[in-house]
C-alpha cells in the first residue's frame, strides 16, 4: 500500500507561482516596449538621414550629374585631338599650296576656334566629350546656364509667332480682294514684304489688337464642320 505525503515546500511554491508569473510578464512586456522604442528610434534616424542625403546632394554629385565644364573635360580634349588628327591625315594627301590643302587648313582653324569657344563659354560636356544643354530652367538658373535655355526658347517662340502673325495679316489684307484665293496661291510679293517688315514688332501689335478685340475672330464667324 503506497502512502502519499504532502510536501509543504511544494505547496508554498504553488502559492507564490502566480505572482511570479505576473511579474515575469510585466518584465517581458517592459523589455518588448523598450526594444520597440529603440527600433522605432533607429528607423526614424535612418529615415531622417536618408531624407537629408537626398535633399542636399554634395557638389560632386550635383543635379547635373555626369556633366563637367568642357574646359576641364578629358573626353572633350580627346575629341578635339581626334578631329584635328583626322584633318591632318587628309592634309597629307595634298600638296602644300593646293586648293584642297588650303581648304583643309581653314577647316582646322575653324575646328580649333570652335572647341576654344565652347570651352570659353563654360558649356558642360558629358562622358562622350560633346557639349550638353541643361533643359531644366531651374537647374539652368542655379548653375548659371540660363542663356542656353531661355535664348533658344524665346527665339523659337518669337520666330514662330512672327511667321503666324505675318501670315495672318496677309490673309486679312487679301480678304478684300476680288479673288483672294488667287492671292493665296500666287503670293503678292510687294504686299508680303511690306507686312514682313511691319511684323517685326508683332508681340506689341498682338497685345494692342487683343485689347481692341480684333485679335480673335467672333464666334458667329467660325464655321463648324458637320459630324
Curated annotation (Swiss-Prot):
Q: What Pfam families does the annotation carry?
A: PSI_PsaF
Instruction: Mark out the transit peptide.
Output: 1-62
Keyword Plastid listed: yes
Q: Which UniProt keywords apply?
A: Chloroplast, Photosynthesis, Photosystem I, Plastid, Thylakoid, Transit peptide
Superkingdom assignment: Eukaryota
Name where it's found: Plastid, Chloroplast thylakoid lumen
Kindly state a single biological-process term from the GO annotations of this entry. photosynthesis
GO CC annotations, alphabetized:
chloroplast thylakoid lumen; photosystem I reaction center
The reply to whether Magnesium figures as a keyword in the UniProt entry is no
Give the family per the record. Answer: Belongs to the PsaF family.
Primary role = Probably participates in efficiency of electron transfer from plastocyanin to P700 (or cytochrome c553 in algae and cyanobacteria). This plastocyanin-docking protein contributes to the specific association of plastocyanin to PSI.
**Protein name per the record:** Photosystem I reaction center subunit III, chloroplastic
Q: In which organism is this protein found?
A: Chlamydomonas reinhardtii (Chlamydomonas smithii)
Gene that this polypeptide is encoded by? PSAF
Amino acid at each position: 500500500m503506497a502512502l502519499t505525503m504532502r510536501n509543504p515546500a511544494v505547496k508554498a511554491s504553488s502559492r507564490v507561482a502566480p505572482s511570479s508569473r505576473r511579474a515575469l510578464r510585466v518584465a517581458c512586456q517592459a523589455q518588448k516596449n523598450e526594444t520597440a522604442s529603440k527600433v522605432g528610434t533607429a528607423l526614424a534616424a535612418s529615415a531622417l538621414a536618408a531624407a537629408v542625403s537626398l535633399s542636399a546632394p554634395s557638389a560632386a554629385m550635383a543635379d547635373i550629374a555626369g556633366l563637367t565644364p568642357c574646359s576641364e573635360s578629358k573626353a572633350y580634349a580627346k575629341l578635339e585631338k581626334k578631329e584635328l588628327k583626322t584633318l591632318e591625315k587628309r592634309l597629307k594627301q595634298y600638296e602644300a599650296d593646293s586648293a584642297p590643302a588650303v581648304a583643309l587648313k581653314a577647316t582646322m582653324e575653324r575646328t580649333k576656334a570652335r572647341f576654344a569657344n565652347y570651352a570659353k563659354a563654360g558649356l558642360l560636356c558629358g562622358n562622350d566629350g560633346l557639349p550638353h544643354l541643361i533643359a531644366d530652367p531651374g537647374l539652368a538658373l542655379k548653375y548659371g546656364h540660363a542663356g542656353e535655355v531661355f535664348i533658344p526658347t524665346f527665339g523659337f517662340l518669337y520666330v514662330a509667332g512672327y511667321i503666324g502673325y505675318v501670315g495672318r495679316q496677309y490673309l486679312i489684307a487679301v480678304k478684300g480682294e476680288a479673288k483672294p484665293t488667287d492671292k493665296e496661291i500666287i503670293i503678292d510679293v510687294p504686299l508680303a514684304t511690306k507686312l514682313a517688315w511691319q511684323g517685326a514688332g508683332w508681340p506689341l501689335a498682338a497685345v494692342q489688337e487683343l485689347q481692341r478685340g480684333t485679335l480673335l475672330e467672333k464666334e458667329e464667324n467660325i464655321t463648324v464642320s458637320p459630324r
